[in-house]
């Protein structure tokens, strides 16, 4: 729906701090997006929108709200992707409109890229609105973790354990050294629990795909998609999650990886 803050193409509610005259427009016409969401809702089709800026997030939520009101019985599922910046006003709307917040959590680290981002949008915005995972969950919303691979931020990774660790710590992964401007990416209270991160990486991601009845949890009748780790993640330090070895991987009941 929009671009990214580093190119000044994310649509924001306030001017860019480093280029106040930069006034980006949506990558896709706003009226077209609203019409598409409405039509999808009417047909029972899901939507998934790329929303970086806080203004783009709001416009997409507005589109979903109008569609929900027009066709309240539709089974359509709507997902807002990325959500780098979300304003306080829009946090409760994710739950109210049953819109999933999809996030590439491995990006939420206090690395040089995020420091540059703070200079672009302004620290007051960045350190208040970035990756608001905990706020959405506390308001009753749904969070799903995804990679956005092969796109990459400072952390060039698609590994689920990397994303889970960063969602819990908001700190740089150990394999990327200590090139950080602060121990935890602000706002620090947006860290989530391990159980919340695991849920976001499994059953709630399956929900986004419309496959929660087949995958995403270990239940009788579902596909045997699972991993066996060398350690119980609940019994180790959060900073060790990403380096925990995968002993076995199974898909559809078939072993696809096994450590010898």
Model-derived segments and spans:
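His/Asp/Glu-enriched, well-ordered alpha-helical/loop segment
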Residues: 35-47, 55-78, 82, 89-92, ...
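Active-site-adjacent helix-turn-beta-strand microarchitecture at beta-sheet edges
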Residues: 1-46, 91
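Non-cysteine beta-strand/loop elements that form the S-adenosyl-L-methionine
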Residues: 1-11, 98-109, 169
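Extracellular/periplasmic ectodomains of large secreted or surface enzymes and adhesion receptors
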Residues: 259-260
């Amino acid at each position: 729906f929009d671009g990214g803050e580093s190119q000044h193409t994310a649509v924001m509610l306030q001017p860019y701090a480093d280029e106040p005259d930069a006034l980006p427009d949506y990558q896709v016409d706003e009226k077209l997006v609203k019409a598409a969401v409405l039509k999808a809702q009417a047909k029972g089709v899901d939507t998934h929108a790329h929303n970086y800026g806080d203004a783009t997030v709001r416009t997409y939520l507005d589109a979903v709200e109008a569609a929900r009101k027009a066709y309240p019985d539709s089974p359509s599922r709507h997902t807002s992707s990325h959500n780098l910046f979300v304003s306080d006003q829009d946090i409760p709307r994710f739950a109210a409109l049953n819109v999933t917040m999809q996030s590439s959590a491995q990006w939420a680290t206090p690395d040089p890229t995020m420091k540059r981002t703070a200079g672009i949008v302004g620290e007051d915005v960045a350190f208040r609105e970035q990756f608001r995972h905990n706020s959405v969950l506390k308001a009753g919303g749904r969070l799903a973790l995804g990679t956005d691979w092969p796109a990459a931020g400072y952390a060039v990774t698609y590994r689920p354990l990397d994303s889970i660790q960063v969602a819990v710590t908001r700190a740089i992964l150990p394999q990327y050294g200590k090139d950080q401007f602060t121990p935890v990416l602000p706002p620090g209270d947006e860290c989530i629990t391990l159980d919340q991160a695991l849920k976001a990486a499994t059953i709630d991601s399956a929900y986004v795909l419309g496959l929660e009845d087949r995958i995403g949890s270990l239940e009788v009748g579902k596909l045997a998609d699972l991993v066996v780790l060398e350690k119980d993640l609940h019994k180790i330090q959060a900073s060790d999650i990403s380096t925990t070895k995968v002993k076995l991987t199974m898909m559809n009941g078939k072993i696809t990886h096994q450590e010898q």
